[in-house]
C-alpha cells in the first residue's frame, strides 16, 4: 500500500502471540456469565479461585471488570502515558510477556458490556465482574457478615448464588468455599454470546 494506506504487510513467517500459528481453535460458542454482589462479598477472591479451577477443566477463561471510579493502568512519566496525555486515542504497549491496548474515551459515553465483549478474543467463557445492571446471566456472591440485602429478588438475571447462607426462595446455590460446585453453577447458567 502507499503512504496513505491503513495497513502494513506483515511477513507471514513471523509468529507472534496475536497471530500464533499453533493457537488453539476458536470455541464454537463463547459463553458469558457475571458475578454480582455488594462490595466485600468476595467476588474477586472467588474469581481468582474459579479461573484456575475452570482452566483445569480445559475451559479457556477471560474476564471483564467494571470499575466504578476513574482508573489508570499506566504510569506517569512513561512513554505510553506521555502519548496518551498528548492526545492519542489509543496506545498499545507490548513486551515479550503481554500487551495492552488503552483507549481514551475523551468525553464519549462509557462503552456497553456488549461493545467490550465484541473486542475480546473468543474464549470458552467470559466472567464479568460488575455491570450488575446489564441483563447477562449472573451468579450472586453473598456474604451474610456484610449485612446487605440479597440482589436476586430484584434482578431476574441472577440465576444462582455462591453464599455462606442459603438464599431466600428457590435459587440454586453453592457454598462460597465449594469452588468446584460454584464452577458447575457457572457453567450451567452461562449464556452464549452473542445471544
Predicted regions and their residues:
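The conserved Walker
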Residues: 39
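Short hydrophobic alpha-helical segments enriched in small aliphatic residues
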Residues: 17-23
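Phosphate-binding/switch loop-helix module in NTP-utilizing enzymes
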Residues: 104-133
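Conserved lysine of the Walker
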Residues: 43
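Short, hydrophobic beta-strand segments that form beta-sheet elements in well-ordered domains
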Residues: 126-128, 138-143, 157-164
Amino acid at each position: 500500500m502507499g503512504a496513505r494506506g491503513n495497513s502494513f504487510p506483515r511477513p507471514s513467517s513471523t509468529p507472534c502471540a496475536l497471530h500464533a500459528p499453533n493457537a488453539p481453535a476458536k470455541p464454537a460458542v463463547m459463553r458469558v456469565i457475571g458475578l454480582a454482589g455488594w462490595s466485600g462479598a468476595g467476588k474477586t477472591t472467588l474469581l481468582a479461585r474459579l479461573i484456575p479451577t475452570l482452566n483445569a477443566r480445559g475451559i479457556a477463561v477471560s474476564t471483564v471488570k467494571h470499575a466504578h471510579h476513574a482508573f489508570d493502568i499506566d504510569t506517569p512519566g512513561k512513554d505510553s502515558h506521555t502519548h496518551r496525555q498528548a492526545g492519542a486515542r489509543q496506545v498499545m504497549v507490548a513486551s515479550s510477556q503481554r500487551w495492552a491496548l488503552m483507549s481514551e474515551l475523551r468525553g464519549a459515553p462509557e462503552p456497553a458490556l456488549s461493545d467490550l465483549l465484541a473486542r475480546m478474543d473468543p474464549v470458552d467463557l467470559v466472567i464479568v465482574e460488575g455491570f450488575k445492571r446489564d441483563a447477562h446471566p449472573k451468579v450472586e456472591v453473598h456474604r451474610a457478615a456484610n449485612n446487605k440485602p440479597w440482589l436476586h429478588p430484584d434482578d431476574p438475571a441472577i440465576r444462582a448464588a455462591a453464599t455462606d447462607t442459603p438464599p431466600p426462595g428457590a435459587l440454586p446455590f453453592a457454598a462460597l468455599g465449594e469452588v468446584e460446585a460454584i464452577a458447575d453453577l457457572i457453567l450451567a447458567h452461562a449464556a452464549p454470546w452473542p445471544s
